Amino acid sequence: MKVIFLRQLKTRGMERKCSRRPGLGPPTLYTFLLGIIFITLSSSRILLVKYSANEENKYDYLPTTVNVCSELMKLILCILVSLCVIKKEDHQSRHLRCTSWKEFSSFMKWSIPAFLYFLDNLIVFYVLSYLQPAMAVIFSNFSIITTALLFRIVLKRHLNWIQWASLLILFLSIVALTASTKTSQHELAGHGFHHDAFFTPSNSCLHFRRDCSLRDNCTSKEWTFSEVQWNTTARVFSHIRLGLGHVLIIVQCFISSMANIYNEKILKEGTQLTESIFIQNSKLYFFGIVFNGLTLVLQSSNRDQIQNCGFFYGHNAFSVVLIFVTAFQGLSVAFILKFLDNMFHVLMAQVTTVIITTVSVLVFDFRPSLDFFLEAPSVLLSIFIYNASKPQNLECAPKQERIRHLSGSLWERSSGDGEELERLTKLKSDDSDDDTL
């Protein structure tokens, strides 16, 4: 009798919980604000990258210098906040030590997403050299396909047949859009802007730039292909007009998906779930500075330009603002992966697609063809079908994750709408010190 009474009591409690409508509580408000911040920063970043280019749709500055400065800003900010957290809770200082093999291997794990983010942040500059911003953000929806494939292959996440069908429609729509896309730097030249340099070049810099111009722009030589060479390489894809811009953005989608999935995994696995996000990001941004710094030092063209012209040569007002926007946009992504999940990050990117497309029509003289108006809605419709067909949870009350934020209190949030989060945060009983690396 007592067992029956307890079951009835539990059932009634579940019914009351299911019938309760979610209000605009603090977690919902934080989610809304975080989404708005991410959309604003992501849209601004794409526009600033485009505005910072010159008349030839190339960059007078070294794009790696933007990434180095933004990583340094994020590292300084996270270290300062981490010191406050450690001072407030002394027991967390152990996360900054590397006195054992386990701690060292745990620290080195952050180098993997840092390297992937390093590539992702660098490729975006060259994607916008070959594609209009509107086309770039639409093609970036290919990351939904790469994320789904990585979830299925790496994390064994299951998709229903409607989701697979929507991904197929998305893939075909993106392929169809390549038929009406300009992917040559020469075709997009003239969409850039004339900038006044912040620093007057020295005599040695003028001689260096003159020699570089004779060698056909040595600054970007390692990141660009000649039109003849690329057209010969891509001749087999001529029936779909596959260009270098398309290849770069497909590679970027794979890299960004892998980076976000792995970063979310180590942000939430085991005891990392309750560790301060600022301590975790300090490790990530340390490796980000290392990889970007090595690029400046090891690339002979980059090293020669810095030696002759200085670190900030070629920068303009837009590139300086871009440093700050890139830094805060990276922090917003970290907060999304820590407190929400990858799917929220992908969904917010769709709003960015609409904003950038609208701005491109108004500012960048982007004139969509009839094919664009027929195929672009198919991309957005397939994304809507993919997210609308996500299976509902069997249990009404989803699992609650408790995550520690800066104030030291615990913020509870739901993880019921993402199967990948449950898999990422599942603890393994057979973990050992040897397999942490």
From Swiss-Prot:
**Could you list which ranges are Cytoplasmic topological domains?**
1-21, 87-106, 156-158, 263-276, 338-343, 389-437
Q: Which residues are glycosylated?
A: N217
Tell me the SUPFAM superfamilies matching this sequence.
Answer: Multidrug resistance efflux transporter EmrE
User: Any idea what this protein is called?
Assistant: UDP-sugar transporter protein SLC35A5
Described function: Probable UDP-sugar:UMP transmembrane antiporter involved in UDP-alpha-D-glucuronate/UDP-GlcA, UDP-GlcNAc/UDP-N-acetyl-alpha-D-glucosamine and UDP-N-acetyl-alpha-D-galactosamine/UDP-GalNAc transport from the cytosol to the lumen of the Golgi.
Q: Which GO terms describe its molecular function?
A: antiporter activity; pyrimidine nucleotide-sugar transmembrane transporter activity
Q: Cite the residue spans of the region called Disordered.
A: 412-437
- Positions on the Lumenal side per record topology: 43-65, 130-132, 180-241, 298-316, 365-367
Stated membrane topology is: Multi-pass membrane protein
**Membrane as a keyword?**
yes
Q: Which GO terms describe its cellular component?
A: Golgi membrane
Entry's family note: Belongs to the nucleotide-sugar transporter family. SLC35A subfamily.
Give me the stretches of Basic and acidic residues compositional bias.
421-430
- Quaternary arrangement and interactors, per the entry? Probably forms homooligomers and heterooligomers with SLC35A1, SLC35A2, SLC35A3 and SLC35A4.
Q: Which domain of life is it from?
A: Eukaryota
UniProt entry tagged with the keyword Membrane: yes
Keyword annotations of the record: Antiport, Glycoprotein, Golgi apparatus, Membrane, Phosphoprotein, Sugar transport, Transmembrane, Transmembrane helix, Transport
Q: Spell out the subcellular localization from the entry.
A: Golgi apparatus membrane
Name the residues that span the membrane: 22-42, 66-86, 107-129, 133-155, 159-179, 242-262, 277-297, 317-337, 344-364, 368-388
Give the modified residues of type Phosphoserine: S407, S429, S432
Instruction: Give me the reactions it catalyses.
Output: UMP(out) + UDP-alpha-D-glucuronate(in) = UMP(in) + UDP-alpha-D-glucuronate(out); UMP(out) + UDP-N-acetyl-alpha-D-glucosamine(in) = UMP(in) + UDP-N-acetyl-alpha-D-glucosamine(out); UDP-N-acetyl-alpha-D-galactosamine(in) + UMP(out) = UDP-N-acetyl-alpha-D-galactosamine(out) + UMP(in)
